[in-house]
Amino acid sequence: INIGCLAALAASQRRRAPGTPFPWWDLRPRAGLGRALAAMPLVLAAFFPIHFVTALAWRCVLHAAGRPLELQEVLLAPLDRGPLVIGGFALLAVGVVPILEEAIFRGALYRSLREGAGRTGAAFVSSFVFALLHFNEASLAPIFVLALLLVIVYEWSGSVWPCVVLHACYNGVNFTLA
């Protein structure tokens, strides 16, 4: 539902980049894309410790507040349904969802907000919306930090493709650990 709503919002944008039917997707490769993709192992090596510390600190905050620590339902849904369903969910989580979410959140929402709110404001607002729309209190802070990193990667590379790679790795690790 949330992706459909944001896709409709993004599709309603009236401005179009020259030569691009849907500029909000921003899926065109950029000149520095190879450099950005080559740096992904370093980005991942830096990200996972930051994510781990954020997740641990957030769990402590939630525990101190007496809040439940539950996994996202989407991670639990396929676990008892057999290998074909698990494989299908894994394909969606690693192959499809990162492309759609990065096109919507970094390619459309962040870029659109950046024009009016500047980079910092757009980064925080789009990251907060991204985290909220995952509908899970236990993962709110870690997903917010992930989204901030994805904005940094997007700004550094000028493309959503490195963000898609990082997002796919993140989803793959989470799906595997669930």
Task: Kindly give the residue locations of the regions a language model identified.
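Hydrophobic cores of alpha-helical transmembrane segments in multi-pass inner/ER membrane proteins
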Residues: 2-12, 160
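Structural signal for the C-terminal ends of transmembrane alpha-helices
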Residues: 10-19, 153-157
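Juxtamembrane helix-loop-helix connectors linking adjacent transmembrane helices
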Residues: 1, 16-97, 115
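Functionally important transmembrane alpha-helices
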Residues: 120-178
